[in-house]
Amino acid sequence: TTADVLQSSADAEEGSSHDSQGSLRTGLYAVGSLSSSASAGEEDGLIQTDVTIVAVTVDETGVITDCVIDAVQAKANFDSQGQLLTDLTVPVPSKNELGADYGMGSISGIGKEWNEQAQALADYVVGKTADEVLGIAVDEATKPAEADLASSVTISIGGFQNAIAEAVDRAQPLGA
């Protein structure tokens, strides 16, 4: 979870002999999109908010030391009069929280769930800078083109590359 990377950062700084110049920095970035929403017509309308969340820790040289990637896909239906049909009091779990219940494993060419693929990408970027993350080769659908990453990640990663770079750029020393 995002809390795990923040705790990891605090633990690393606590055990570090670095001064404030050499301590880890923590970055968080979230971006949302409504592009999957649909107007009501003959059928009910859908408002769908997709939010990508990335948390990183980076060292004094800008190298990623830890990364967590998650996403929330919140959906609500409404009728042609604009009346909400969805119970808005029901919590919306993140894709990491859903795990196997998200249901990607059965349709993925590599049999991996979304959370497993996000973790594989997060692991892959550890040891890289923001520029190196942005330089990861992708195809026209922004899916990994590098063989070792493509063997564990089949989802589009272009948005994640940008979100990781933004999290690195926003990283601040939080202290421990």
Where do the model's predicted regions map?
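Active-site- and interface-proximal helix/loop "cap" or "latch" segments in soluble metabolic
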Residues: T1-A176
